[in-house]
Amino acid sequence: MLYYLFQYLDKYFDFPGAGVFQYITFRSALAIIMSLLISTIFGKRVISYLSRLQVGETVRELGLEGQTQKAGTPTMGGLIIIFSTLLPVLLLAKLNNIYIILLIVTTIWMGAIGFLDDYIKIFKKDKAGLKGIFKVIGQVGLGLIVGTTLYFHQDVTIRENISKNKIEVYSTQKGANTLSSDKKSTATTIPFFKNNEFDYAELLAWTGDGYRNYAWLIFIPIVIFIITAVSNGANLTDGIDGLAAGTSAISVIAIGVFTFVSGNVIFSNYLNIMFIPNSGEMTVFIAAFVGALIGFLWYNSYPAAVFMGDTGSLTIGGIIAVLAIAVRKEMLIPVFCGIFLAENLSVVLQVSYFKYTKKRFGEGRRIFLMSPLHHHYQKKGYHESKIVTRFWIVGILLAIVSIVTLKLR
């Protein structure tokens, strides 16, 4: 909204300083400051309000050190993250940008699913929360919306250096002119390879001519799978104070780097990566999101004054998934979201091995002392602050590795 206001003032009144709102970098800086202030100031009031409503966490007895002290800690703190992200975005971003629209829909959609889950747990006294099938239906529904929009919407394109269709001439960093064309594509990026583009449509090449017309049959299910997997991974990671918020902020910063360079024709040309028109605007959303996560971490760090609940964790996972897909970096998710992957795998391996050994030997055996992975280290006697700090360090290393793939091939 402020973007359009200052655009109007600059155009018709030549208002001093109004032109800076045209720059993504300025609006991104403003967004992170604004969201950080909102989450820290507004967050304190939300926590007090949740405490008065007695919206407290019900802790299951798992035999973990310090677990009983967490009982009654306000939950649903994800509302702080959602509000602190959306308000700066609504004020500073271009609201007619298809990527911004998708991210706003994702935030509200996944936030609603998480809120219902937390509401049922707290007010209906049902520890199971929202039934798993309904969560999956919600995640699949969002995947259908995102996948269909990214595949069919005319503003979702990539630019390649060819001389057909919509030809444009733009200046490269060295001043030379290059012929280019915006086109619809299901291409993505494969890390560590020199010619690192892969088109999902190629998976249907065996069907004969015209296979590209049916690429949506591959692309949309992949989008659904990624959104479901990453949102569940974030949900599993939210187990100890500050873990999910901190690791998510690190992952989102890495995606922010990808988004900025992929949406900038000069940087994308220099790095020889896919240029994605209109995607640079997502940097404003990412900045607001990072600020909201850091501001929330102010209250969620050990000892936590508030938990994000499924309201926050499902929203975080959904946003990260959509960002990665939109910027064509979903194949890097196992790297910059390596913590989510490890948490997910620890649960899958634990459950699968337990069932297998119970069937074969008559008693279930475990790989880890407890899953998800962070509980394994708690059982080994590590304090949760040490676990969180070390997971953050690993997350930073993974984020750096993922960014390095821009040049290392």
Curated annotation (Swiss-Prot):
GO terms for cellular component: plasma membrane. It is a multi-pass membrane protein. Pathway: Cell wall biogenesis; peptidoglycan biosynthesis. Its cofactor is Mg(2+). Its EC number is 2.7.8.13. It catalyses: UDP-N-acetyl-alpha-D-muramoyl-L-alanyl-gamma-D-glutamyl-meso-2,6-diaminopimeloyl-D-alanyl-D-alanine + di-trans,octa-cis-undecaprenyl phosphate = di-trans,octa-cis-undecaprenyl diphospho-N-acetyl-alpha-D-muramoyl-L-alanyl-D-glutamyl-meso-2,6-diaminopimeloyl-D-alanyl-D-alanine + UMP. GO terms for molecular function: metal ion binding; phospho-N-acetylmuramoyl-pentapeptide-transferase activity; UDP-N-acetylmuramoyl-L-alanyl-D-glutamyl-meso-2,6-diaminopimelyl-D-alanyl-D-alanine:undecaprenyl-phosphate transferase activity. It is an enzyme of class 2 (transferase). It is found in: Cell inner membrane. CDD domains: GT_MraY (cd06852). The chain crosses the membrane at residues 23-43, 73-93, 95-115, 132-152, 214-234, 247-267, 279-299, 305-325, 331-351, 386-406. Keywords: Cell cycle, Cell division, Cell inner membrane, Cell membrane, Cell shape, Cell wall biogenesis/degradation, Magnesium, Membrane, Metal-binding, Peptidoglycan synthesis, Transferase, Transmembrane, Transmembrane helix. The keyword Iron-sulfur does not apply. It comes from the Bacteria. One of its GO terms (biological process) is cell wall organization. Its main location: membrane. PANTHER family: PHOSPHO-N-ACETYLMURAMOYL-PENTAPEPTIDE-TRANSFERASE, PHOSPHO-N-ACETYLMURAMOYL-PENTAPEPTIDE-TRANSFERASE HOMOLOG. Catalyzes the initial step of the lipid cycle reactions in the biosynthesis of the cell wall peptidoglycan: transfers peptidoglycan precursor phospho-MurNAc-pentapeptide from UDP-MurNAc-pentapeptide onto the lipid carrier undecaprenyl phosphate, yielding undecaprenyl-pyrophosphoryl-MurNAc-pentapeptide, known as lipid I. Belongs to the glycosyltransferase 4 family. MraY subfamily. This is Phospho-N-acetylmuramoyl-pentapeptide-transferase.
